[in-house]
Amino acid sequence: MNKYDFGGKQMKKILLAASEAVPVVKTGGLADVTGALPKYFDKEKYDVRVMLPKYMCMKDEWKEKLQYHTHFYMDLNWRKQYVGVLEMEYDGIKFYFIDNEYYFNGYAPYGDMYADIEKFAFFSKAVLSALPLIDFRPDIIHCHDWQTGLVPIYLDNFRYGNEFYRGIKTVMTIHNLKFQGTWDPKRVRDITGLPQYYFAPDKLEAYKDANYLKGGIVYADRVTTVSNSYAEEIKTPFYGEKLDGLMNARANCLSGIVNGIDYEDYNPLTDNKIERNYDVSNFRKEKIKNKIALQKELGLEENHKTMMIGIVSRLTDQKGFDLIAYVMDELCQDAVQIVALGTGEEQYENMFRHFAWKYPGKVSANIYYSEAMSHKIYASCDAFLMPSLFEPCGLSQLMSLRYGTVPIVRETGGLKDTVEPYNEYEKTGTGFSFMNYNAHEMLATVRYAEQIYYDKKRDWNKIVERAMNKDFSWKNSAKQYEELYEGM
């Protein structure tokens, strides 16, 4: 029985095309999906590979692992560009890298939009052009965000002249509809060399701009986003970022699949970044020891009974920090400690610095990002605050559930799908939530959580238990993607 034959069926070949993936290059949650998801597919049935740009800013340890596969020259309209293809194997998954120093030479994966528009047009075309030369013909190309939005369009264009590309299907996953990759159509036509046919309001064009994400959504066979609620929300004007009409038109092909987290990296029982390891059987004793260690490290008042609220986030409006700023003074009157970690808009960075100065024993402002500190916060805090304006999926609440840190969230997108609100009568729920984007509604919910924490400790511990027993590993997400692929 050969490796492509199980029960008379062929092995399905999947290519994930994206602009970033862990552990090689990461700027956000997209990298977690494209890097972690592939290894959770059924290896008997799926041959899953990943294709990325080879950025100059990648760490040397990864560059040294890359092996040369082939190179060729590709037309990008009137330009003739070098395309190198390198490869490596990591965690049993084959990664390909598209090399071109002119496009990928910056100090960061993304630069200014003008450069990125050409860079990712090149990448999208190179992904397809490389396939015949690496002897891999995928059944499905799974594209992620606007950076690969042109892949389904180029594929449509390639089909006419080349048998190789006929029958290849595409999936377009939207991680955040806010970022669409838009530029002047004349310039985009000059860059891409695509026929005028594609530059129409029912195709690539949106509001007089060429829009990469829109093009991908129009031409992909299936469109997914990263939670069921977000898939519904983006059909409305408030969340739809001017594409709600298109999302409604594609509703039959649109579905939401929640991201997972890597249960090996995020495991309170084996995590070497935290003071004391624990699991659902002994968190009552061991979690407190993490809290005291963190209080000591951050110079907060040492008291294991004080409710500690954690925040790990980009400090931006989207994440609800205008709500926090509005009631922070009131919140600091309560018997709580607040530990914040992250960088972002200056006004919010300074807001946390101000309150850390005003309430030195109660508030700790860590205006930087550190993986190790984030693990300590998940392991030490009692609650985790995430009052987002919108949240396509959100990973922080999944990490806090895993560590038994009770999430307090606004009911939107992935937060609504993954955090079940506490019900004191039925004794159910894994967190606390509020509905309206309102600072005092948020404050009332935090205070309700405080009340349960201080006055009904047994109920609180049961919430923690239920949270820790939830399964948001990548296994679940991979199963749903497998079902999606099978239905195509």
Predicted feature residues:
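Catalytic cores of nucleotide-sugar-dependent glycosyltransferases that transfer UDP/GDP/TDP-activated
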Residues: 2-488
